Amino acid sequence: MSQEKYGVLMVNLGTPEAPTPRAVKRYLAEFLSDKRVVDTPRALWLPLLYGAILPLRSPRVAKLYQSVWMDEGSPLLVYSRRQQQALAASLPDVAVELAMSYGQPALPQAIARLLAQDITRLVILPLYPQYSCSTSAAIWDAVARILTGYRRLPSISFIRDYAAHPAYIAALAASVERAFTRHGRPDRLIISFHGIPQRYAEEGDDYPQRCDVTLQALAAALDYPPEQVMMTFQSRFGRDPWLLPATDETMKSLPSAGVQHVQVICPGFAADCLETLEEIQVQNREIFEHAGGSTFHYIPALNDDAAHVDLLHQLVTAALRPSAPPPAVVSLASF
């Protein structure tokens, strides 16, 4: 009889514990100190970060968080916790933990809780549909560092990404079609992904290609002219060139091209957060309308939708199948 004990570690980026300047400063300091996120030499970056960026940005960003904060807390944490609870309910014999790369719930404690249950197989599920060195790889780095403190390790499966998984594409397509039914068919469907510095892509990060994989699969799944689907990149930070076209610049230019109705979906975000609820739904709406556009709708993230939970269930069960790579190896899966 098998003595296997399974565990799942779901990981998302992170969020401040409160919408206050102090909490935001603490969160941003941890996030922006990660070399996977900003790889500027530490001697140059850290004085700039602590001397200028954190003091200036923290109060402003705290106000933005206040505008989207839910009764239960940060939207990212609220929806991620619901995802964890729903996935755990669908996998009654599997220990399911949630962690954030930065902030709470913290990775070291989540891993400690899993290993305390003597699990023999661990699935690490980054909640990033498209791999990037600044997100998925940062989780790999952090988990590896934490595990150096343990003598006994389980076999580990790391889900690299799921950019083209059929259940993921189907869930996105259903979400878009619901929006079309509710708001009508737009002149353009904007698929906005979080951006990364262009240099990261030039140095080998295949994130742009993984975004394009999702774009092409989603466009093919929709009953909508593919030429009216546009991919853009948001959330630029710093002065380095980032992936183009930029979402905000696209919003400025569309009305002059005769586009009056846009709908925007952000498939790289597994849960709604500041970047979707404030940057897209508020800021980019204002940009579009100020430029002369008339109708703007944001299509929510998949969050804890049943189809999304089913996708997560499929990802985990595939990684735990007996046909998966045998114990004693670390496997990397991309769907």
Curated annotation (Swiss-Prot):
Q: Which GO terms describe its cellular component?
A: cytoplasm
Tell me which Gene Ontology terms the entry assigns under biological process. Answer: heme biosynthetic process
Q: Which residues bind Fe cation?
A: 194, 275
Q: Per the record's keyword annotation, is Cytoplasm included, yes or no? A: yes
Pathway participation: Porphyrin-containing compound metabolism; protoheme biosynthesis; protoheme from protoporphyrin-IX: step 1/1
The record's GO molecular-function terms, alphabetically, read: ferrochelatase activity; metal ion binding
Instruction: Specify the signal sequence span.
Output: none
Q: Which UniProt keywords apply?
A: Cytoplasm, Heme biosynthesis, Iron, Lyase, Metal-binding, Porphyrin biosynthesis
Per the entry, what this protein does is:
Catalyzes the ferrous insertion into protoporphyrin IX.
UniProt xrefs under HAMAP family: Ferrochelatase (MF_00323)
The name this protein carries in UniProt is: Ferrochelatase
